[in-house]
Amino acid sequence: MARRSQGTKLHLAVLCLVVSCHAIGLSDLMERASQRSDKLHSLSTSLTKDLDSHFPPMGRVMMPRPSMCHTSSLQTPKDKEQALKVSENELISLARSLLLAWNDPLLLLSSEAPTLPHPSNGDISSKIRELQDYSKSLGDGLDIMVNKMGPSSQYISSIPFKGGDLGNDKTSRLINFHFLMSCFRRDSHKIDSFLKVLRCRATKMRPETC
């Protein structure tokens, strides 16, 4: 019941966002998007900590390198200094491309979480669904933003996800689940950073305060 109530509240928030955002300024839209991306990154960090609490001893050794994340092919700024040199149109394009690239992986994680061999799989499953909700909400908000910014900001890079199976044994499932979550956490941090830079520019804050 609590889950349904929470989902209803978020759904109403999304509806309010879609209906009202067309009538408000770009800086306010940036602020709302930044708040949602911050929540997205916070949730992914919490999930990673949950997974760390019950991780196989050899997990760190066996887990694929970050360069194996399916979004690694997308060229993005490596730090804030580089991000500050990137145009608004490119930053919003990168954020939307990363967000879209996680639709299918989040579906996979959502389907695997309830039976994950982890004592907190119920909480993990609930948080994954929250990630999906916030990702959808943020994506809807960014769509409205680019409509205000113009055609040059609407380009999205297509990033295919070829994974569809976490493995058959318990260790493989835990490691691959954790790997995907670590990739998402990395990308959610990028999305959050890009949107915060955009927010700073929209509100004409000094770059060093972004």
From Swiss-Prot:
Belongs to the somatotropin/prolactin family. One of its GO terms (biological process) is positive regulation of gene expression. It comes from the Eukaryota. It comes from Salmo salar. GO terms for cellular component: extracellular space. The keyword NAD does not apply. GO terms for molecular function: hormone activity; prolactin receptor binding; superoxide-generating NADPH oxidase activator activity. This is Prolactin. Pfam families: Hormone_1.
